[in-house]
Amino acid sequence: MIRVRTSLKKCDVSLGLRLISTTRTNPTTPTTPRKRRATVFKDTLNKGPSFEDFVSGRAAEVSLDPLERARSTVEENQRLPKWLKTPIPKGSNFHKLKEDVRDLKLSTVCEEARCPNIGDCWGGNDKSKATATIMLLGDTCTRGCRFCSVKTNRKPGAPDPMEPENTAEAISRWGLGYVVLTTVDRDDLIDGGSHHLAETVRKIKQKAPNTLVETLAGDFRGDFQAVDVMAQSGLDVYAHNLETVESLTPHVRDRRATYRQSLNVLKRAKQTVPTLVTKTSLMLGLGETHEEVIQTLRDLREIKCDVVTFGQYMRPTKRHMKVVEYVTPEKFEFWKEQALEMGFLYCASGPLVRSSYKAGEAFIENVLRKRKPLEQQQESLSAFRI
């Protein structure tokens, strides 16, 4: 019995060794490598610098994105050109407006965005020619654009229900000829705050019927219902800013804001109320090219945008993106001429121009006031036909 068991064990061991050896040396077994799915990291790595680029010292140049490449040519401590220096704001009108803003618990983009033109817009002697830009829906934005100094938070406080009434009261006190209502982005609200804005416009028109109202609103995440609510609120100018050219948009604006979405918002506002003046603004000095600015103007004319403004990007703090170029006043004048030649109704262009700067300038005011009687005539004719 012992001999039989020993021989069986020897057979088992030898059989096992044979099986192992045949498995290892079988040349017919297919060995197809498993294909890995593409990832953003993998795509970026494949498009990045090669080993030869690292050896030759070209790696940094190859890996830079367009915005960083433009910035790499900027001097770190370049001096502010003389045409960008402004006097300290002063004057009785300036201080009166500031006091009323505090008393009525209102926010202004003039202060929040540290606008260099606050003294010019608020401090003029003729109040009917002054322009104030009231910021509605609070002073905290749900988005974080890399050029903007307004506070950000995912969940800002609830909108003040008295804000439409208080804003209308302030406008009627000041006796302004033109007011701009702007707003932080409120992605936390279902309608993006469109009904709150529209109610403010209606209140102003009730208390100050001769005041022209412009709203500088966000993109409402591309929600056309919200755009329609704003366009039909009784406002005079519908403004929404592209901010920059298409290639720089992902680097400059919040990821939820896209170039095409902004164009569609302006297009929808015009389609909803064809007599509405539509307006947008572009910052220069971010690294944009001549051809890109021309293409942006073409895109705007294609959707029948009426007004465009150009201004110099100014870095609010060291935490924000750097200035690539200080554009000269002569170049701003060139862009103004280009815009007017392309058929824009009006163009404000200059180093210190902002989207709301001198919004009530005589030319655009005259255009709006001339349109009023025509609109009233059309309404009377349509009512007569009914």
Swiss-Prot record:
It catalyses: [[Fe-S] cluster scaffold protein carrying a second [4Fe-4S](2+) cluster] + N(6)-octanoyl-L-lysyl-[protein] + 2 oxidized [2Fe-2S]-[ferredoxin] + 2 S-adenosyl-L-methionine + 4 H(+) = [[Fe-S] cluster scaffold protein] + N(6)-[(R)-dihydrolipoyl]-L-lysyl-[protein] + 4 Fe(3+) + 2 hydrogen sulfide + 2 5'-deoxyadenosine + 2 L-methionine + 2 reduced [2Fe-2S]-[ferredoxin]. Keywords: 4Fe-4S, Iron, Iron-sulfur, Metal-binding, Mitochondrion, S-adenosyl-L-methionine, Transferase. Pathway: Protein modification; protein lipoylation via endogenous pathway; protein N(6)-(lipoyl)lysine from octanoyl-[acyl-carrier-protein]: step 2/2. Pfam families: LIAS_N, Radical_SAM. One of its GO terms (molecular function) is metal ion binding. Residues 124-345 form the Radical SAM core domain. [4Fe-4S] cluster 1 binds at C110, C115, C121, S356. GO terms for cellular component: mitochondrion. The keyword S-adenosyl-L-methionine applies. The keyword Nucleotide-binding does not apply. SUPFAM superfamilies: Radical SAM enzymes (SSF102114). Binds 2 [4Fe-4S] clusters per subunit. One cluster is coordinated with 3 cysteines and an exchangeable S-adenosyl-L-methionine. Belongs to the radical SAM superfamily. Lipoyl synthase family. This protein may be expected to contain an N-terminal transit peptide but none has been predicted. NCBIfam families: lipA, PRK05481.1, PRK12928.1. This is Lipoyl synthase, mitochondrial. It comes from Zygosaccharomyces rouxii (strain ATCC 2623 / CBS 732 / NBRC 1130 / NCYC 568 / NRRL Y-229).
